Regions:
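Acyl-CoA/ACP chain-elongation machinery
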Residues: 182-227, 260-274, 304-311, 325-375
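Glycine-/small-residue-rich "gating" segment that lines the acyl/pantetheine channel
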Residues: 125-131, 172, 176, 194-248, ...
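Active-site-proximal alpha-helical scaffold in enzymes
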Residues: 78-91, 140-143, 148-153, 157-192, ...
Length: 411
């Protein structure tokens, strides 16, 4: 069987630190975080007061007012990011084989705001007043369907939910679909819009969220004073193609996807394995498929949620696989935690880091926990060559998903 090389030819996103790749990368370079006081609902009775909300979402660019009746925000975010990715890739969707054009949009929670709104309506006004579009708007697979319908993609179409590992698993699935010849083009990523009372209350009940009042110190991965993650929102979508397909249409290639590792801790519903056993295996699998040695990896975009449990295990896993020298940073210090969309947005961050040979700092972090042995970049970013990089994501349920990328050098 012929194995195809898989390349990234475009991406788009909406995020707390930018609604274009250029805005997003500029924020990562200059240290502009997207965390602030929650504005989406009254949080006065909550212990949590900060989130990372999408700012200045360009709704009017692709949507009209009635679209809010058809799409939950998580679908709107995915549709926006998908259109931006297709445009960024200069992809003429009418000129490609639609049967070999697939879509995967991951989401950890889906349309939770729609569910919350309609449950309130149910209790206040009765069952006959629940809106007909409630379930279609809320279903976590609907963003994939909506994106496929927007572009007429008749190939693979699915949604993946492995909690906070969802987007990396989606990209890994798309990568393999092209590598093994099932598709030519995949529009893939993740989307989330979960800054809602119920979602915040639920994660608050788990003591998973940061209760720090100062936004600049709310998401501080690997720091000794970290006390939880900051809820973020947004979407990232990438265009993946076989190298042959991309070259045939004269596409600009941004990076190559070279490896994917997926494992399960099978340990605990919400806590990662304390020694990072699943994370270690996932990183090793990604490197094995990429056919690279640990010494070739020059940057790790860490899962780095700013929770006490995650960073201890992840730091140990990184050191076990890659050693103590490879630069590590967490862009969740800028964006908060986008749950099911985290991997896609962080894949874009990783590729941008490779393209610019610059490791973004871990913003807000000032003093590492004593047991953190990984080479965490904080205080300022780091200029260095990045020929290969990996991006880690781990999720509730013990899910571990790791992607390996290669900088594109026209060969």
């Amino acid at each position: 069987m012929k194995l195809n090389r898989v390349v990234v030819t475009g991406y788009g996103l909406t995020s707390p630190i930018g609604n274009t790749p250029e805005e997003f990368w500029n924020s990562l370079q200059t240290g502009k975080i997207g965390i602030g006081e929650i504005t989406k609902f009254d949080h006065s009775e909550f212990a949590v007061h900060n989130a990372a909300e999408v700012q200045d979402f360009p709704f009017d660019k692709y949507f009209v007012k009635k679209d809010t009746n058809r799409f939950d925000n998580y679908s709107l975010y995915a549709l926006y990011a998908a259109q931006e990715a297709v445009t960024n890739a200069n992809l003429d969707v009418e000129a490609i084989d639609k049967d070999r054009f697939g879509v995967i949009v991951a989401s950890g929670i889906g349309g939770i705001k729609e569910i919350e709104d309609q449950v309130i309506r149910l209790h206040e006004k009765g069952p006959k007043r629940v809106k007909p579009m409630t379930l279609p708007k809320a279903l976590p697979n609907m963003a994939s369907g909506n994106v496929a319908m927007r572009f007429g993609a008749n190939g693979i179409c699915k949604s993946i939910n492995t909690a906070c590992a969802s987007s990396n698993d989606a990209i890994g699935d798309a990568f393999r679909s092209i590598k093994f010849g099932f598709q030519d083009v995949m529009l893939v990523g993740g989307s989330e819009s979960s800054i809602t009372p119920f979602a915040i209350a639920g994660f608050q009940a788990l003591t998973a969220l940061s209760t720090t009042e100062d936004p600049a110190r709310a998401s501080i991965p690997f720091d000794k004073d970290r006390n939880g993650f900051v809820m973020g929102e947004g979407s990232g979508m990438l265009v993946l193609e076989s190298l042959e397909h991309a070259e045939k249409r004269g596409a600009t290639i941004l990076a190559e996807v070279v490896g994917y590792g997926n494992t399960c801790d099978a340990y605990h519903m919400t806590s990662p394995h304390p020694e990072g056993q699943g994370a270690i295996k996932a990183m090793k699998l990604a490197l094995e498929e990429a056919e690279i040695s640990p010494e070739q990896v020059a940057y790790v975009n860490a899962h780095g949620t700013s929770t006490p449990a995650n960073e201890k295990g992840e730091s140990g896993a990184i050191v076990a696989v890659l050693g103590k020298e490879v630069p590590v940073s967490s862009t969740k210090s800028f964006t908060g935690h986008l749950l099911g969309a985290a991997g896609a947005v962080e894949a874009i961050a990783t590729i941008e880091a490779m393209r610019h040979n610059f490791v973004p700092m871990t913003a807000g972090t000032s003093e590492l926990s004593d047991y953190i042995e990984a080479n965490v970049v904080y205080g300022q970013g780091l200029e260095q060559e990045i020929p290969y990089a990996i991006s880690n994501t781990f999720g509730f349920g013990g899910h571990n998903a790791v992607l390996a990328f290669k900088r594109w050098e026209n060969k």
